[in-house]
Amino acid sequence: MLEPFQILSICSFILSALHFMAWTIGHLNQIKRGVNLKIRIRNPNKETINREVSILRHSYQKEIQAKETMKEVLSDNMEILSDHIVIEGLSAEEIIKMGETVLEVEELQ
């Protein structure tokens, strides 16, 4: 039987992971909007274009790293979650798969 502290820790981890996924998706959307705005720059010179592309590339790389970190954290704790918790009829594996699917759909857009 799990102690209340263990249950609280597991729930806290799940909420943190879901918050991190939402944060990552939000930042990916910001990058997408930023790309659309950058295309509308009027009469840009080569230096401006290179600077903006560099900024976008750096932001995109940071978001990819954040996504990979999230996947590692979730997979590292998969056994703990699978053994101890089910949320609204969904297993931990199903919750993680749903989160990965959302991120993949965001990448495709």
Swiss-Prot record:
Residues 58-83 form a coiled coil. The record marks H19 as: Essential for channel activity, possibly by being protonated during channel activation, and by forming the channel gate and the selective filter. GO terms for biological process: proton transmembrane transport. Keywords: Coiled coil, Host cell membrane, Host membrane, Hydrogen ion transport, Ion channel, Ion transport, Membrane, Phosphoprotein, Signal-anchor, Transmembrane, Transmembrane helix, Transport, Viral ion channel, Virion. The record marks W23 as: Seems to be involved in pH gating. Residues 28-109 are intravirion. Pfam families: Flu_B_M2. Residues 1-4 are virion surface. The keyword Mitochondrion does not apply. Influenza B virus genome RNA segment 7 encodes the M1 (AC P13879) and BM2 proteins. Normal translation produces the M1 protein. The M1 termination codon overlaps the BM2 initiation codon in an overlapping stop-start pentanucleotide 5'-UAAUG-3'. Termination of M1 translation triggers reinitiation on the BM2 AUG in the +2 open reading frame. Homotetramer. This is Matrix protein 2. It comes from Influenza B virus (strain B/Ann Arbor/1/1966 [cold-adapted]). The lineage of its organism: Viruses, Riboviria, Orthornavirae, Negarnaviricota, Polyploviricotina.
